C-alpha cells in the first residue's frame, strides 16, 4: 500500500480513503466538536496526503497514524475559530423539538451535549496534551503510532498522556466537590471517564 500511495496510484488512495476516512472524521470531530468542520478537515487531510505522497516511507505499517497526524494539526488550527459554534451546540438543549422529527433531533441534541462536554474538558488541557490524549484514547493508536503521527519520541507521548490523565482526574475531583450534593454514588464525571479510558499497547 505504501509503495502504491507513494507512486500516486489513484486506486491505492481510494482504498486508503475507504479504510481510514471514518477514523479521520471521528478524530476531527472529537477535536473540534463540529460536524461540518470535521467533514472539511477529513477532506483537507486526504488532499494534503495526496500532495505529500512522495514523502511517504515505503517501509512501515498502516498509514492511519500519518493521516491522523495531518488531521490533528488541521483540527487544532480550526479549533481557534470554533468556540462560538461549540457554544451554539451546547445551547441546542433549549431548542423545541418538532414532533415528526423528534427522535432524530433529540439524538442530535444529545450528541451536541456530549461534544460540548468533551470540548469543555479538552479546552482545559494544553494543546500537546490534548493531541496525545485524542490520538491514544479515542483514535486507538498505540504509543509508537502516536509518536509517528506527531513526529515526537515515544517517551514524550507517554509523559504528555500521563500529564493529561492527571489533569483530567484533578478536574473530576474539583467538579465532584462542586456538585457533591447532586452526584449519584459511584457516578463518574466526564473528566473522570476520559482519564480512565485505556490506551492500546504497542503491537508486535
Outline where the language-model segments fall:
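C-terminal edge and immediately downstream basic/flexible tail or linker adjoining helix-turn-helix-like DNA-binding
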Residues: 4, 87, 93-94, 148-149, ...
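Sigma70-family region 2
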Residues: 6-7, 30-33, 44-61, 81-83
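Acidic, proline/glycine-rich intrinsically disordered inter-domain spacer in sigma factors
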Residues: 95-123
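A short, charge-rich alpha-helical start-of-domain segment used by transcription regulators
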Residues: 3-26, 50
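Helix-turn-helix DNA-binding module
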Residues: 40, 120-131, 139-156, 167-170
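Short helix-capping/turn signature of helix-turn-helix
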Residues: 19-22, 31, 134-142, 151
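Arg/Lys-rich amphipathic alpha helix in sigma70-family domain 2
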Residues: 51-58, 69-90, 94, 103, ...
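Residue-level preference for hydrophobic side chains embedded in well-ordered alpha helices
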Residues: 16, 20, 24, 28, ...
Amino acid at each position: 500500500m505504501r509503495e502504491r500511495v507513494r507512486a500516486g496510484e489513484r486506486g491505492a488512495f481510494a482504498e486508503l480513503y475507504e479504510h481510514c476516512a471514518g477514523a479521520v472524521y471521528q478524530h476531527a470531530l472529537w477535536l473540534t466538536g463540529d460536524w461540518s468542520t470535521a467533514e472539511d478537515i477529513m477532506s483537507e487531510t486526504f488532499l494534503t496526503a495526496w500532495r505529500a505522497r512522495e514523502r511517504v516511507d515505503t517501509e512501515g505499517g498502516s498509514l492511519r497514524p500519518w493521516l491522523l497526524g495531518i488531521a490533528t494539526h488541521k483540527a487544532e488550527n480550526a479549533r481557534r475559530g470554533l468556540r462560538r459554534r461549540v457554544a451554539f451546540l451546547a445551547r441546542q438543549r433549549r431548542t423545541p423539538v418538532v414532533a415528526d422529527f423528534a427522535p432524530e433531533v433529540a439524538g442530535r441534541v444529545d450528541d451536541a451535549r456530549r461534544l460540548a462536554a468533551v470540548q469543555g474538558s479538552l479546552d482545559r488541557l494544553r494543546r500537546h496534551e490534548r493531541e496525545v490524549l485524542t490520538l491514544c484514547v479515542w483514535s486507538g493508536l498505540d504509543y509508537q503510532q502516536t509518536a509517528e503521527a506527531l513526529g515526537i519520541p515515544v517517551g514524550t507521548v507517554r509523559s504528555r498522556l500521563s500529564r493529561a490523565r492527571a489533569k483530567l482526574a484533578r478536574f473530576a475531583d474539583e467538579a465532584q466537590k462542586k456538585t457533591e450534593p447532586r452526584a449519584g454514588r459511584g457516578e463518574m464525571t466526564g473528566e473522570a471517564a476520559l482519564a480512565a479510558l485505556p490506551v492500546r499497547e504497542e503491537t508486535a
